[in-house]
Amino acid sequence: MKPMQRLTCLLALCFAASASAKVTMEIPDTIDLLVVNGSSPKLSGGFFDATKKLELEDGEQQIVFRYSPYFSQGNDRIIIDSEVVIATFDAANQELRFDMPKYRDAPQATKAIKTMQWQLLDQQGKAVELRQDRLIKEGMQIGRNFEFETAEYNKKGGVAALTSSMAVQPIAQQEISNATAMAAAEEMLHFWYNKADAETKARFKAFVNQQ
């Protein structure tokens, strides 16, 4: 093989190895992933899938999420929401999953979820080292702009603030308004879907699948 051909093959192999080095996260339906690295997350998987996937570049990561375990009570589904968690960690070429507390029923969850202990585990089952905090907002919770709140949190240098350059990127006012509207619409959609009976949910699924 000629030297130029060998160099070309070597570069191709290096590029392929670099391109395949990703961080993947398994997102169960009890995790409401709100912000990833300053932006709305792009998850793979269908709307009704119990688990979705998130793919990230290697490096420092920041996630904002809410844990929402649910319980059956007669014909109703009871959802208990945690406070909004913000966490920062480093990851490279890893497969990560949430390790969240399990609750017997809604009353137990209501009592214990405010002090919940959770972890991110890698493919070997080892806990990922991370820094975490709560993203607190007083008053009305519906329609919160989590991207804006996260940016403000990072500017103030909280415990789980990003240290990379993406932490100080400005957010345009129009983007803030659009993000707020989308967040509110999605939150209300999930709220009313979980309140619906089985027949209404079936009609809604049929409608979504036709779009």
From Swiss-Prot:
InterPro entries: UPF0319. Residues 1-21 form the signal peptide. Coiled coil: none annotated. Keywords: Signal. HAMAP family: UPF0319. Belongs to the UPF0319 family. This is UPF0319 protein VC_A0026. It comes from Vibrio cholerae serotype O1 (strain ATCC 39315 / El Tor Inaba N16961).
